């Protein structure tokens, strides 16, 4: 390749250097986003792997033999003894402080145990605890009677290797074997699982893959757009080289090198930029915790692969486009008219996703090997199909607009759109894809419904109260002493003991719980029978009970012969009072289960998997919209630069700049509005297909206000991108610039 021809093609004016700088800058932004998103995906996977041990459930700690002579009956349960290769573990699912859920694991082990606990090694001694750094900081900054007294004596911190993130709240406590067995919820553990998702692995993988495609696609679109900057000027120079004797192969190689060099510079700068932004990106909380900075590292091999792929693809596309150009082409290129066949990719993608949903309805056909490719592949086809069908719809709209045009700006804009629908739609394709992606994210995250606490009304547990079941074997005197201490706490209004025939964990507990009638008002009841002892159905204590339950006269005249089965502590509802009461109950030694409130139900919603991805959804919205805004600004500016000769001649003939502005605005508005409603509708339909394909029990609702804010931001970015080109329009269509052309 002749170096002189390369210099002639590349060097020449300030605009040429500006175009190369624009390509480098756009590629830098694209590569930076690609690496950060790649690192984020790797970080989420690494974070989930570190926290996988928290999913360990172990095996039963009791043995229930089959009764002799009756296979359907069972004998009394007997404890399975501890051995050196097992530990006794109790999972506390409702250890709550304020509105935060603390992962607590209680362990009891023999002194000769060989089981290693992730993050600490040997199990803690009874009365000691290990905490994550974030939880220990919280304990040290909080009065002990609100949090610290629940756990015992601090023994050390949990290593980062066992923590999902730096904000994780995890505590590992030591207890005696008798304490854990008495609670009835302990299990034997000989090792810890490394599967972070359990039965939700396929659903989690599907969501992450679709999310990655949804966010990566706009980034690739941005890179594609910026590498086409100044296409008209390039075509003119390359056509000149062809006319003076350069072979098509030579010109194609020149075009490839011209694009590859700034792309390489931009890609390298993008790698550096991603490295510098990594600490700031790690501060974004996902599912309640940030990521460690090291989680976002992709490694130099991955960075080199991204740089190589971006530069190679940019160079090959530039060379291919130049090789296809005619020898006499200078400014305008006649596009091939889009046909109705462009609808095929979109329809194929929709059919694939609908087939995946149909398979989930047929138990005999359900298989991740079928569902995952159909959902992910269908989504990718729909995403590409929107970009493919856009020019065809834009051309149809422009034909209608041309018939209805009543001004010069409308006629010129509609005529150009009809001649070049592909180039016109390309300028807004990023924003159209962003609206689709935002609609998908908003629709999918609309199933995230907070499980609100029931309102404070008679017949239901009050939201400001805490209750805990009493362990078997505790005397009324022990429970009464714990309630006496609870009444002395600041913010506690009452403390009530419920009685029954046996502890609620035992088979002969009975369906009713008994209270003193004098204590009933403290439980929120208004209609109280005129007896000394009253009864209520035991479902009164369940968090999911929504219908008020009535009090009835008890069939007994006194509590003699009954045992304490539950304690209920009423507070003034302040966080401090709730946490004091919770700490006292959990450390009293008489409760079989941790104290809980109906307000805690929100923290244990069954849709926690999707809740954890909500932040990713809104982050994806922001990334898609930001990239789309940049793409539209670059495309609109590029369109002005490519047509500055034509627009300049219009001004030279007397057309006001205001008319030129209206032309540019219409050329951006028509394709955007043409496909906007389609993108919104498809986005919510695809979200519904995804949601029902992952779990057919999920239901979508109206999107959050954030979605409408995102749509408004998209339109605002579109308006800003068009307005930003107005100054460019005036400068490059001035009389002096036109004479130079």
Walk through the language-model features, giving the residues of each.
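N-terminal Sec/SRP start-transfer signal
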Residues: 1-32, 339-345, 352, 392-435, ...
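C-terminal membrane-exit region of the final transmembrane helix in multipass inner-membrane proteins
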Residues: 301-335, 360, 713-741
